[in-house]
Amino acid sequence: ACQAAVVPIVAMLTVENVFVKPGSKKEAERAIGVHAQLAREGGGSSDFSTLLAIYQLATEGGSTREWCNDNCIHWRAIKTAQSICEQLGAILDRQDVRVDEKDEKIVSSDSMSQRARQALCYGLFGNVARTVPGRRSYRTMDGHGTVAYIHPSSVLFGADSTPEWVVYHELVDTAKTYMRTLCPVKYAWIKDLLPRLHNVDVYRLSECSAKRPRKDSEAEPSSPPPSPKR
């Protein structure tokens, strides 16, 4: 399977501020350069593979703190991700799910494996977007049809060509709506998943079924007014 790739990605998505953004101009320029190199290490085609490359490079040996300092990565974010990986690994062990790391090493490869990207489709099928023909914007497929743009921090930002279909981790609303942390996907992977978006019970997912708004026909009949006293 692809757990060896997906588990670290999930862990990295749960932490904030992975990238250090120095205040001085000189250090900021250096950070941009090293972050671009890290994106290339992950294949340069997916923000998820960049996160995986960062995790693997930071934890594969030596001093994690020193590596983070050299590459403008927050050390505490990596340590937190490591802890989450251990917790997720323990859960997989209890479920008797084996992780075959040799099949899912991403560093120095051209891209994430197809299995890992397909797994992201299944996990994030509610966060699918399709490009708007003739424009550099997308529309989300969640039923709202929100117009969204690739976030400037993405490795896909400013690319000569944009993928037709992507999955994203989150939407960020500023002057525009941006998709942050993206991965190109194929329509064949998601065509059977898209209809599920119309069958999702958000109240059940959020454990709020008891508070579900009732239709007028389901409303309890109002009690008759008390009889006036004589």
At which residue positions do the language-model features occur?
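Acidic, low-complexity intrinsically disordered tails
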Residues: 212-230
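Second RecA-like catalytic domain
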Residues: 1-215
